């Protein structure tokens, strides 16, 4: 693996993720993402879909290790009962909406998700995200949209 991580490449036409269908987020993209948004590094952050730890490695560069919580399949984020100041992740695309809705409830301050802008294509998904009163103003919408 290179410093930039693996590239996102193949399409998966089934609704089940293949075990080999794993793509780490490039370190450089995570750094750019974190630099584009303001975070208080004295507060807690959770990465609930850490995979092999690419985003977590960068989070540990920005935060003290004791403030970073990271897990993957061993804990189901959708059943999470704890709260964190920030949620930062590249969620599984097929359940990204469920991750967003869960993050609205467990992130004390904000959440930041790495998703393609095309994720908002489709009226139903867009309406569900933006009709929520907590996301209806432009500053709150930055919870999950950061232009890179």
What are these regions (language model features)?
Residues 1-148:
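Class I S-adenosyl-L-methionine-dependent methyltransferase catalytic core
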